[in-house]
Amino acid sequence: MNTSPGTVGSDPVILATAGYDHTVRFWQAHSGICTRTVQHQDSQVNALEITPDRTMIAAAGYQHIRMYDLNSNNPNPIISYDGVNKNVASVGFHEDGRWMYTGGEDCTARIWDLRSRNLQCQRIFQVNAPINCVCLHPNQAELIVGDQSGAIHIWDLKTDHNEQLIPEPEVSITSAHIDPDASYMAAVNSTGNCYVWNLTGGIGDEVTQLIPKTKIPAHTRYALQCRFSPDSTLLATCSADQTCKIWRTSNFSLMTELSIKSSNPGESSRGWMWGCAFSGDSQYIVTASSDNLARLWCVETGEIKREYGGHQKAVVCLAFNDSVLG
């Protein structure tokens, strides 16, 4: 892997944030210093993801996907794709970086071949409602797709077969995630509920089976994201209620509430907690919120360790990678 000294890709910790001010910002996680700003002219950024080899970052926006180089300070995207209708809401990668997946308001999830320099859409999965989220099963063979009609689709990439489940009809699924051990799947929705399933199967030719585990009334307002920790012991949920809540997966009890609510009764809402990402050791979490800040928190104590200030508008997505490649 060729990384130039002084580039984002040369840092063992990559933290990037983006949102409504049409910039992607890169931060030195421990100091809070912004080390690079990329102008993302065409629209807001809805989702960010770092490639598994840490060479590029994908930014999903309105009717496009842009990929920026992490190993140079090139301000321009090195790969662009503009052939998608409406907002691209979700983006991620196969673990070997062979393909990328996206989902969006055009009611499609797509798989893109990354082996050629021009993005080729290889496969399309069509649903009947705008897609809010797509996540990849750790087996790399099934995509979980959540849509605004309340449906969760499990798309088996090997057979092209799909199953669907609807936890609450007509209540939009905003985020879904499977823990690294493939023991649980969680999904949150626009009423603030979080559903958790036990997973079985999903090995070899077996299709993943979902067994309902629990329903958590996690938030009283819109929930925006759910993420399991790398060690599978924690689940984080983010919401429009200005909190990110950390739940223990041993019994799905609340461990910590991270809040950006003001202690000053006269101050209005600081806005939504849009997204989060755990550190590799599961001890810390970074959040993105619409008060223009990202924050680094200690998971156990709920203490804010660092604030990342510089965005001029809401921060709605982030990407965090502190795993050092061997």
Swiss-Prot record:
Modified residues (N-acetylmethionine): M1
Compartments where located: Lysosome membrane; Cytoplasm
Family note: Belongs to the WD repeat LST8 family.
Crosslink site: Glycyl lysine isopeptide (Lys-Gly) (interchain with G-Cter in SUMO3): K86, K215, K245, K261, K305
Function noted in UniProt: Subunit of both mTORC1 and mTORC2, which regulates cell growth and survival in response to nutrient and hormonal signals. mTORC1 is activated in response to growth factors or amino acids. In response to nutrients, mTORC1 is recruited to the lysosome membrane and promotes protein, lipid and nucleotide synthesis by phosphorylating several substrates, such as ribosomal protein S6 kinase (RPS6KB1 and RPS6KB2) and EIF4EBP1 (4E-BP1).
GO terms of biological process kind: regulation of actin cytoskeleton organization; TOR signaling; TORC2 signaling
UniProt WD repeat ranges: 1-37, 40-80, 83-122, 126-165, 168-207, 218-257, 268-309
Designated name of the protein: Target of rapamycin complex subunit LST8
Residues modified to Phosphothreonine: T51
Superkingdom to which the source organism belongs: Eukaryota
Keywords attached to this entry: Acetylation, Cytoplasm, Isopeptide bond, Lysosome, Membrane, Phosphoprotein, Repeat, Ubl conjugation, WD repeat
GO CC terms: cytoplasm; lysosomal membrane; TORC1 complex; TORC2 complex
Gene of this entry: MLST8
